[in-house]
């Protein structure tokens, strides 16, 4: 029996008018082989769960310290003003994230969702009627090609349902992966970082050769 495909997704934006023609649903994948100095979504680099802290809803001023008590690593403490301070170096390596379940205010959340292909298709089918003639779905990230087996299955299902597909990618993947995915892509934004190899390594951390 084949294992059901899943992907790590850190955001899904419905009713977007960016990243492709018309009204769109943008799906942001976790994980990227590049680490661009100018990246707008550095929280998406690592292919793992991530923690998000919303200070504005935190009940620290009402004496709550549930997350501090729950954290087994001591990575959440009070600063000099009595506000919770998160040690992101430790938290970004945490696999269990006990603090999330302890937070009654919902100020601590996992900003990564584990979705099956059926899960994502259910969302896209829900949004489909709002896209209009020019709209569709855009796969972004992170780098969507990093989770290519899942993406390939989703793209095939999208085309079976006559959904227009787009991708935002650096193109940083094996040739066979690139060609496989682009069989079912209608519109592509390919972000070439720099043609000079040394500048590419300086800006992204990897060679372009």
Sequence positions of predicted segments:
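Radical SAM enzyme [4Fe-4S]-AdoMet core and its adjacent flexible, acidic
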Residues: 1, 7-9, 52, 114, ...
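N-terminal cysteine/histidine-rich coordination modules
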Residues: 2-42, 46-50
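Fold-independent oxyanion-binding glycine-rich loops
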Residues: 12, 42, 88-89, 111, ...
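Cysteine-centered iron-sulfur cluster-binding motifs in ferredoxin-type domains/subunits
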Residues: 26-39, 51-75, 83-106, 112, ...
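Residues at secondary-structure transition points
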Residues: 49, 81-82, 94, 111, ...
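Fe-S ferredoxin-like electron-transfer domains
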Residues: 75-84, 99, 108-119, 123-134
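Acidic/glycine-enriched edge-of-secondary-structure segments
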Residues: 105-112, 198-204
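Conserved AdoMet/S-adenosylmethionine-binding subsite of the radical SAM
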Residues: 118-209
